[in-house]
Amino acid sequence: MAKNKFNKSWLQDHLTDPYVKMAQKEGYRARAVYKLSEIDEQDHLIKAGMTIVDLGSAPGSWSQYVRNRLTELGKSNPKIESGKPDGQIIAIDILPMEDIADVSFIQGDFREEEGLAALEALLPKSAEGKVDLVLSDMAPNLSGVGVADSARMAFLAEIALDFATAHLKPEGALLIKCFNGSGYSQIVESFKKVFKTVASRKPKASRAKSSEIFLLGKNLKPPK
């Protein structure tokens, strides 16, 4: 009975959520797009000419936003074809994702050799395979057990950080989703070891009752 009440409560929240309605109206696949857009507006993450990797991209709203943002920036560059993005977007997920124009999608696991090789084959040779921005909205399937869910989220954060450390340009940035709970402080410390600047963000589109928080790292520290 409690589960049914929870499901009904979630459905009611979902149906009345202004961000859900806005996403439907604007053609985005998920309300999560507004979390990224708010952080981008605050921190100016997305710039013309960037190569951006979207980890755990399905259903695709973050890739949609990046594509639209780079296309808007491309309007001021006469070398960019009309309606095309000024930059490169690579998305990867173990789940399928419907095509998005100008987004290179790989269905695979970047932790495994085959998936990583497919992703790296798309990286710009001119930049020695390095990228400007890595995004991760990855989240585990929730069990409802707080400690277990936090541990799974911490694992996803660490693998995103490992990927970014290996593939970012020195001035690059990483934005990931976390849970502000058990293990969060350790993730922050891991970020501080890698990035010169670390900040947390709780966008308005992130539900107040959710422990969800976003962690942003900018500018890699030189390797020791």
Swiss-Prot record:
- Asked whether the UniProt record includes Nucleotide-binding among its keywords, one would answer no
Q: Where is this protein localized, as stated in its record?
A: Cytoplasm
Q: Please list the reactions this protein catalyses.
A: uridine(2552) in 23S rRNA + S-adenosyl-L-methionine = 2'-O-methyluridine(2552) in 23S rRNA + S-adenosyl-L-homocysteine + H(+)
Gene Ontology CC terms: cytoplasm
Keywords annotated in UniProt = Cytoplasm, Methyltransferase, rRNA processing, S-adenosyl-L-methionine, Transferase
- Which InterPro entries does this one have? RNA_methyltr_RlmE, RNA_MeTrfase_FtsJ_dom, rRNA-MeTfrase_E, SAM-dependent_MTases_sf
Residues involved in S-adenosyl-L-methionine binding? 60, 62, 93, 109, 137
Record SUPFAM superfamilies:
S-adenosyl-L-methionine-dependent methyltransferases
Q: What is its EC number?
A: 2.1.1.166
Molecular function terms, GO-annotated: rRNA (uridine-2'-O-)-methyltransferase activity
| Gene3D superfamilies in alphabetical order | Vaccinia Virus protein VP39
Q: What is its main location?
A: cytoplasm
**Active site residues according to the UniProt entry:** 177 (proton acceptor)
Name of a matching Pfam family? FtsJ
The entry's function note states: Specifically methylates the uridine in position 2552 of 23S rRNA at the 2'-O position of the ribose in the fully assembled 50S ribosomal subunit.
Similarity comment: family membership: Belongs to the class I-like SAM-binding methyltransferase superfamily. RNA methyltransferase RlmE family.
Q: What name has this protein been given in UniProt? A: Ribosomal RNA large subunit methyltransferase E
Species this protein is from: Polynucleobacter asymbioticus (strain DSM 18221 / CIP 109841 / QLW-P1DMWA-1) (Polynucleobacter necessarius subsp. asymbioticus)
